Amino acid sequence: MFDFSLEAIVYAKAISLLATVAVVMMWLFYYCYRLKQKNEVIFGTHHAAYIAYSVCIIAWISSNAYFHTDLLPELGASAGMFMAKFANLASFFAFAFAYYFSCQLAAEQRKGKVHRWQQGIFVSLTVYSLFINLRPGLTVEHVDIVGPSQFIIEFGPHTSYFFIGLVSFVVLTLVNLVAMRTNSSKLTLAKTNYMIAGILVFMLSTAVIHLGMTYFMGDFSLTWLPPALSISEMLFVGYALLTSRFYSVKYIAYLALSVLLVCAIFVLPLGAIFIPLTESNQWLIAIPICALIGITWQLLYKKTSRYASFLIYGDKKTPVQQILSLEEDFKLSIDDAMRRLGKLLQIPNDKLRLVTSNYNETFYEEYLSSNRSVLVFDELSEELEYKVSAKRSMKALYDKMSSNNTALVMPLFGQGKSVTHLLISPHKSNNQMFSNEEISAVQTLLTRVQSTIEADRRIRQSRALANSIAHEMRNPLAQVQLQFEALKQHIENHAPVEQITLDIENGQAAIQRGRQLIDIILREVSDSSPEHEPIAMTSIHKAVDQAVSHYGFENEKIIERIRLPQHTDFVAKLNETLFNFVIFNLIRNAIYYFDSYPDSQIEISTKTGPYENTLIFRDTGPGIDETISHKIFDDFFSYQKSGGSGLGLGYCQRVMRSFGGRIECKSKLGTFTEFHLYFPVVPNAPKADTLRTPYFNDWKQNKRSNEHKVAPNVQINNQSPTVLIVDDKEVQRALVQMYLNQLGVNSLQANNGENAVEVFKANHVDLILMDVQMPVMNGFDASQRIKELSPQTPIVALSGESGERELDMINKLMDGRLEKPTTLNALRHVLGNWLNKNTASSACEAERE
């Protein structure tokens, strides 16, 4: 009677095969669990074929394990013949279902069904295989048994045809997978590469050993190896089916080579010691050897992996290690570290961006959850292609990333798991996908440097505050200085009291404008959340009128270029103070270009809808390039505007979100810019008329009454030298013009660099006072062009710039520098230096002529 005990299977080959069975079974259970989690359909899809293939692999490995146990000699030749035929059928059906699995995949890719001829091949070969293996003597005639792992199978006459059928399935499977690569996406290519790799390892090992060594050479000692290697196909194919993120070929080769090198270090010396020992002594020394391997593995792996990296990548550090080593670089300079990171990821120059999550978070936050911590464009493409249910929810995200040429969005989570920053990357320059090891390495790196990034953000915030206040305050200070000069002249000329009072009021208005600018800037850089501010229902017309009436305009000419909403009022729930600052920001951005674009205007209008109402703020200035329009709500982003904090529009977005709405930008370069402020419809709201007050309708008249034009038109004196004043701010030009009048010098004005070149060509100019930062054309470019026309004409920078680069450019392109706002004495000194030199130079040239 047969007596089974564990000792019957305690053989290295049998244990290896049974361990493989355990791994495959666990993988199969996990695979089915993931399908259930994802609510995937199994029957009628490639999943059913893959599961059937996996079951056949388990049966095949188990039947092969039988031949390497004591069960083989104990049960005899008849049981051996049965298990040999069972192994034949298990391996055949594994190959057959692998083939049908590839047919099903190809059919799903083309959105069709498996071809009839493919089904015919599957059925016909299956019937034939069952026939020749179930009928005695056709594939296996006899099994000669010596002991475990020591046996010879005598094949029947149909064995060669049986193996031809297996080879046919291998070839047809590879043909299907290779055909799937044609006109496929990058993600589909990666999936098929993984599947082909797994199938090749398994099927080639089977073909070489089962066909070559057993059938032709009669050696059955290695028949256990193909079943053990079948795990490669299981894992590679299953991984490709379950995931959309893959490790690169080089990284897999690096890991494999590192492990092989460590194994070689252990096997060669330890094998020389272990093999000569008797079987009883081998077990005694096995335990300390295992302990030695466990203790030293990590150290040896760390050492040998450097050489593996050098062989694979040509560098002792892998790209993953190089990415993680950027941690110290981030502490020195985030911008430089981001450039190096972009280079390692093969991103085009300076296209990799780390932005705060003001605008983008509102769009991406619903997708950036714990189960989707990274948004990858290629993965979205696959979901839209294969999952009909995902199309509605994912289409908008796909279109957004596609329009912005975005390939990767990775969040940084702060306290409370809220998104603080977003790493946004375009597609790689080599058009490859982001590999799994790259994404994991970048995630780890950003987690490590998050505190550094947050500290840098606060430092930038402080710098932006200081820079913005310093820049913005120059204009109101110049206005105050201008009013003091005018007041001084009026007192000396014994002007009436009314005129002196008006000068004082104008000076006070300039001071108030300065205070307002400081309040706006402090609001921009504040970390306080607008969500906690109280909100109330109000008429949008009233809110706009009130905000505009409180804005500190420099002169009445600006007021004349603003059109307020006249029709379609609606009720909005908002905080008036916060809303005022939103309007202030939009007005300030628009009027910045008024001097350079004299025909530009501001038009504010409204539009109602069933779910949300819209306030449209339109200016017909320079417009915004479409390629950067999506960046304008990012913190510290400034476009064609010097001295700004780059925080204003991000603040506007936060405020609008606190109202339950949002702000969006629509622009056409060179034509217009529109900001659409969306407010949710207020249910059961009273009529807007009842919330409106007529008080603010006369805001233009109130503003005009306090405006006074200080600088009169100047008559050109042909006997006096002429100075060209170039500045985009009228108040700065007016102040310099007043000083030049007092010094008896003629003046011409230009509001940007391009205008300055035109004025210079049309008039005789002895000296140019040139601002640096201006729209349309800056002072550096204008100076370069003017110097090409007239190298002798002195150009003095009229600027408050203090940056190292700007000062270096001033020294290279200009002849001197005046602080802005300037003073009478400073201007007199410059005129004394340059006008005398220039007059002498002109006289010498005239004498030569």
Swiss-Prot record:
Membrane topology: Multi-pass membrane protein
A GO MF term: phosphoprotein phosphatase activity
Residue span, Histidine kinase domain: 468-683
Residue spans crossing the bilayer: 9-29, 41-61, 160-180, 196-216, 220-242, 251-275, 283-301
One GO CC term on file: plasma membrane
Keywords, ordered alphabetically: ATP-binding, Cell inner membrane, Cell membrane, Hydrolase, Kinase, Membrane, Nucleotide-binding, Phosphoprotein, Protein phosphatase, Transferase, Transmembrane, Transmembrane helix, Two-component regulatory system
Residues where Phosphohistidine is found: 471
Residues with the 4-aspartylphosphate modification: 771
E.C. numbers: 2.7.13.3, 3.1.3.-
Annotated localization: Cell inner membrane
Catalysis performed (reactions): ATP + protein L-histidine = ADP + protein N-phospho-L-histidine
Cited PROSITE patterns: HIS_KIN, RESPONSE_REGULATORY
InterPro entries for this protein: CheY-like_superfamily, HATPase_C_sf, His_kinase_dom, HisK_dim/P_dom, HisK_dim/P_sf, Sig_transdc_His_kin-like_C, Sig_transdc_resp-reg_receiver
Domain annotation Response regulatory: ranges: 722-835
UniProt-listed PANTHER family: HYBRID SIGNAL TRANSDUCTION HISTIDINE KINASE C, TWO-COMPONENT HISTIDINE KINASE
Primary role: At low cell density, in the absence of AI-1 (autoinducer 1), LuxN has a kinase activity and autophosphorylates on His-471. The phosphoryl group is then transferred on Asp-771 of the response regulator domain. The phosphoryl group is transferred to LuxU, and ultimately to LuxO. At high cell density, in the presence of AI-1, the kinase activity is inactivated, and the response regulator domain has a phosphatase activity. LuxN phosphatase acts on itself.
Protein name: Autoinducer 1 sensor kinase/phosphatase LuxN
Biological source species: Vibrio harveyi
Lineage: Bacteria, Pseudomonadati, Pseudomonadota, Gammaproteobacteria, Vibrionales
